[in-house]
Regions:
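Short, internal strand/loop/helix patches
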Residues: 26-63, 68-69
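Short, glycine/charged-enriched secondary-structure capping and boundary segments
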Residues: 19-23, 54-56, 75
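Short, thiol/selenol-centered motifs that function as redox-active sites or metal-ligating centers
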Residues: 13, 18-19, 59, 111-116, ...
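Flexible, glycine-rich phosphate/dinucleotide-binding loops
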Residues: 14, 68, 77-78
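Non-globular targeting/processing and membrane-anchoring segments
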Residues: 73-131
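Structural microenvironment flanking redox-active thiols in thiol-disulfide oxidoreductases
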Residues: 1-32, 43-48
Length: 131
């Protein structure tokens, strides 16, 4: 059974303070982690806005009909909680999809840094979270 994976970086790397999200750094990161899937730049941030992504990382899993079956965390690890990064939450969702089972019922939101939006182009859904 096969699934397609794509990594999308929607952060605005044009601002000097977000240089860690540059294409050069993305290539280095992907090489160091052994990514064997496309890792692309969402230059105009339209992918993030279309998916209503809020943070990095944010995980979305779609079935073969392009229906969203999972949106949530990679796993329960958080800085300082001593839970190992193992991908358990996303893995459970993928396993359910590949085994033609119902999507996992518990879908906890991702935790991470906010997407670095282009100045003045923050989507309404993001601005409403800040208020």
């Amino acid at each position: 059974k096969n699934i397609a994976v794509i990594g999308i970086n929607s952060n605005d790397s044009s601002q000097e303070k977000y240089a860690e999200d540059s294409i050069e750094k993305m290539k280095e990161y992907a090489t160091n982690l052994g990514y064997n899937f496309p890792y692309v730049v969402d230059e105009d941030q339209s992918a993030a806005k279309n998916f209503t992504a809020q943070c990095t990382p944010d995980f979305f899993l779609f079935d073969s009909d392009s229906a969203l079956v999972y949106r949530g965390q990679l796993d329960g690890s958080r800085p300082g909680n001593d839970i190992p990064t193992d991908g358990a939450s996303l893995r459970s969702a993928v396993d359910a999809l590949l085994n033609s089972e119902e999507p996992v019922s518990e879908q906890l939101p991702s935790m991470g840094c906010n997407i670095k939006w282009k100045v003045g182009e923050e989507p309404d859904y993001f601005l409403s979270l800040k208020n």
